[in-house]
């Protein structure tokens, strides 16, 4: 847990783009199209940039233990299940808590952060109360369709950890 951490969110490329960065005219500040890149205007030199934004927020860094044997998809599922569990147990809106995958390509970790304006104190409460942290993990397990105590499949006819279970778009 880290209170008031500085978060930097980097936008590396266009969603459907292949190349990193964004080409802009250094005089106009306008983004350049592929057509404009083919015939550059010497009056408006082109520069490739990366866009970023930053914020200050409380964060909680979760490192799934290797013995879980989670694939990247498993860590992503855990990420969304933890977010959903926190939302439900703390009765907060989905926009008030967020998470990002971090770490190496071979071993991903989860960084949860409060995305509401100012601190809402949820992550601080979870970090300082091991019983609440355990409750979050138990709720996440339930959200994925299992009873932790009995290892029972709560919904045998439904897919586990489905879009409907984990996301709220």
Question: What label would you give each PLM region?
Answer:
Residues 1-169:
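Extended, highly charged accessory segments
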């Amino acid at each position: 847990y880290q209170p008031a951490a500085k978060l930097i969110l980097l936008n590396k490329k266009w969603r459907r783009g292949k190349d990193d960065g964004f080409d802009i005219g250094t005089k106009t500040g306008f983004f350049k199209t592929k057509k404009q890149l083919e015939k550059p205007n010497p009056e408006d030199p082109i520069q490739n940039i990366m866009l970023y934004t930053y914020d200050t927020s409380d964060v909680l860094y979760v490192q799934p233990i290797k013995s879980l044997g989670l694939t990247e998809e498993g860590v992503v599922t855990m990420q969304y299940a933890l977010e959903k569990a926190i939302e439900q147990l703390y009765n907060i809106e989905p926009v008030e808590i967020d998470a990002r995958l971090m770490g190496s390509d071979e071993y991903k970790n989860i960084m949860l952060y409060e995305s509401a304006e100012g601190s809402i104190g949820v992550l601080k409460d979870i970090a300082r109360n091991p019983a609440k942290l355990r409750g979050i993990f138990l709720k996440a397990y339930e959200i994925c369709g299992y009873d932790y105590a009995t290892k029972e499949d709560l919904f045998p006819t439904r897919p586990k950890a489905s879009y409907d279970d984990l996301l709220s778009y």
